[in-house]
């Protein structure tokens, strides 16, 4: 495939995506990060079914159980928001990484670089954002702030989503 063919990959089916917000305090009404992720996905015609959106507490077991449920339902992509920092309650990465078949190291590296350059400066080093595969499925874990969600979605996830799914399923 040429560079343009990689960029312009068209899938012959709809992408099934889920959004999981990890927070002790957010509700569907106050979940700015998760709601922004859903809105940005709709811009590329990826709609989130009501059963594919959830908020769970900062609890490793609760996060793992929700992820495993969606993975069993053959959701193509799961985006988690929140719980990626270094605070004691930030356990999203500890729940996600044991599930991954392959980590996509470039995602975390680029996310931190772009966060540093375009959003939060040196505070980017606190982010443990990660992405990886589970069989033919993808998981992206990003911080819960709207700035982080917007950056990850617009600069990394949306531009490569079709290509990533194509590569995973060929």
From Swiss-Prot:
Belongs to the MoaB/Mog family. SUPFAM superfamilies: Molybdenum cofactor biosynthesis proteins (SSF53218). One of its GO terms (biological process) is Mo-molybdopterin cofactor biosynthetic process. This is Molybdenum cofactor biosynthesis protein B. Gene3D superfamilies: MoaB/Mog-like domain (3.40.980.10). It holds the Pfam family MoCF_biosynth. InterPro entries: MoaB, MoaB/Mog-like_dom_sf, MoaB/Mog_dom, MoCF_biosynth_CS. May be involved in the biosynthesis of molybdopterin. Keywords: Molybdenum cofactor biosynthesis. SMART domains: MoCF_biosynth (SM00852). NCBIfam families: molyb_syn. One of its GO terms (cellular component) is cytosol. Pathway: Cofactor biosynthesis; molybdopterin biosynthesis.
